[in-house]
Amino acid sequence: MGSRAGTGAIASATCTTRVEWVDTDASGHHHNTAVIRWVEECEARMFRDLGLLEHVAQAPRVRLEVNFRAPLHFGQEITTELRLERLGERSMSFSFRVWGGVRDEEPGGAPPRPAADGLLVTACVPPGATVAAPWPEHLRRTLLAAGGTPPAP
């Protein structure tokens, strides 16, 4: 995971993995739902690295947009980039990109290409609650500090 101060992101993470057999469908390339799982894995890693893992269980998805741009194949190395773009009082918005690199069976291969990008919005719903609530102050401070943005007074 890497924080990116000065890039406009409040906080960010970059995760690398491979397309596994379970990620593919009958057409021989990744199943669309795999993109969502890779994004959520990167989100969990970002919060774990910031010491905020408990947050993940209280942040249901309220909006998800995915643009599928290119297929990814079994064994292919991929990189997921996640950026926290907006931290609201009760929700937060992420942008993401999933990049595919060189397929193992293609020697000399092509340069990485974007396979998917999109937007993910989560809301703060504490355990036992049924409606959104404000994010805890310690979470806001930690996220803002990760991106080099000072907390609002």
Where are these regions (language model features)?
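Catalytic strand-loop segment that frames the active site of acyl-thioester-processing enzymes
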Residues: 1-49
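HotDog/MaoC-like acyl-thioester-processing domains
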Residues: 2-15, 68-77, 85-153
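A broad, structural micro-motif
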Residues: 30, 59-61, 115
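Residues that form generic nucleotide/phosphate-binding pockets
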Residues: 38, 50, 142-146
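Short, basic/aromatic beta-hairpin or loop at an interaction surface
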Residues: 50-59
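Short alpha-helix capping/helix-loop boundary micro-motifs
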Residues: 63-67
